[in-house]
């Protein structure tokens, strides 16, 4: 599963793991991606989205219809 949120666009960040002796190792900071299924009344069907935890909160606040309309306007197939 790609570490990419369909709602917020969150992608992995890159940085370093730093040990006690301050040696640096490259690492990747992945967003908290969850696979969630939502019922979308305007489409009258279920839609499965890969969303971050922040994306889930965005859906709770704005509503699934508004969020799905924005995703479809970007040309993403659901």
UniProtKB/Swiss-Prot annotation:
It comes from the Bacteria. The keyword Heme does not apply. One of its GO terms (biological process) is translation. GO terms for cellular component: ribonucleoprotein complex; ribosome. Residues 1-31 are annotated as: Disordered. Keywords: Ribonucleoprotein, Ribosomal protein. The keyword Ribosomal protein applies. Gene3D superfamilies: Ribosomal protein L28/L24 (2.30.170.40). One of its GO terms (molecular function) is structural constituent of ribosome. SUPFAM superfamilies: L28p-like (SSF143800). InterPro entries: Ribosomal_bL28 (IPR026569), Ribosomal_bL28/bL31-like_sf (IPR034704), Ribosomal_bL28_bact-type (IPR001383), Ribosomal_bL28_sf (IPR037147). Belongs to the bacterial ribosomal protein bL28 family. This is Large ribosomal subunit protein bL28.
